[in-house]
Design a protein with these regions (language model features):
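Acidic/His-leaning functional-site neighborhoods
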Residues: 57-141
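Hot-dog-fold acyl-thioester-processing enzymes
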Residues: 15-92, 142, 146-151
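HotDog/MaoC-like acyl-thioester-processing domains
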Residues: 1-43, 104-106, 115-151
Length: 151
């Protein structure tokens, strides 16, 4: 009975042609007997990064989903990968807040940035001068798992 993950998600309906958010028709919601609410649940505010560690990554074909956007799981890869093997060998995420801001499309380069203060890191994924995702992670130190990366 121990909770190992808690998730908050907000979903919207998007018009594929105009790429704009549109209202959900009441008859679509009715079968689910769900209350209608215009209120959006929001996660934490993410601070601007002042002096981040930064690494660029090329967006590859296999990073994409069927809509031609980068798959959501890839953002976490970029967030973790920039931390480096030495850190990741001795730390595991305890709490992750991840906000998807703007989709990343095929081709091009993204920049993964982070700043660390103690066991807390702030992250930003950006491309073409736009923020695509932001994250805040609380880490827990762990014993090395009996192997050393690259040795």
């Amino acid at each position: 009975g121990e909770a190992i993950i808690q998730m908050m998600a907000t979903f919207v309906l998007m018009d594929r042609d105009s790429r704009k958010v549109r209202a959900v028709d009441p008859e679509i919601v009715a079968p689910y007997q769900s209350d209608f609410s215009k209120k959006l649940l929001r996660g934490p505010k993410y601070p601007d990064l002042e002096n981040p560690v930064s690494k660029d990554y090329h967006v590859r074909f296999y990073d994409l989903d069927m809509n031609g956007h980068v798959n959501n799981s890839k953002y976490l890869d970029w967030v973790f990968e920039v931390m480096g093997a030495d850190f990741l060998t001795h730390h595991v995420p305890k709490k992750v807040h991840l906000k998807y801001v703007k989709e990343v499309l095929a081709g091009g380069v993204i920049t993964s940035q982070y700043e660390q203060e103690g066991l807390k890191t702030q992250h930003q994924i950006s491309s073409d001068g736009h923020i695509n995702a932001q994250a805040e992670i609380e880490w827990e130190e762990v014993e090395e798992k009996g192997w050393t990366y690259g040795k």
